[in-house]
């Protein structure tokens, strides 16, 4: 149900974390339930960071601060710095140490000014997509992209 989707997502995240970290996991939530279960292989990283991709209103930022490790967004708007500031405030209000991870999915080559603005506003990672194509095309694209990023 739409008005319960945050609860559903939180329960799935908690259930997955238990499967990743406990030898024998179980979960009993309103929407997610399972008895004694085992999941192998376990992640190498003890705490798998969970980032939520969502439009960033105040309620969403509060929810992310309370339940996730960070936020993933696309640069469709020019107010990413303000949204990151809102997330940081929610993070502090939730009593979380450090700061949330922020990843931005981009489709075009950013200018040096764009990169500086992302860094200044607290973006940790920029993520480019790759073409849905065969291996040779994807590897060629990555080589071309690597050359652009280095220049």
What is each residue range found by the language model?
Residues 1-151:
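Active-site-adjacent structural elements that line small-molecule/cofactor binding pockets in enzymes
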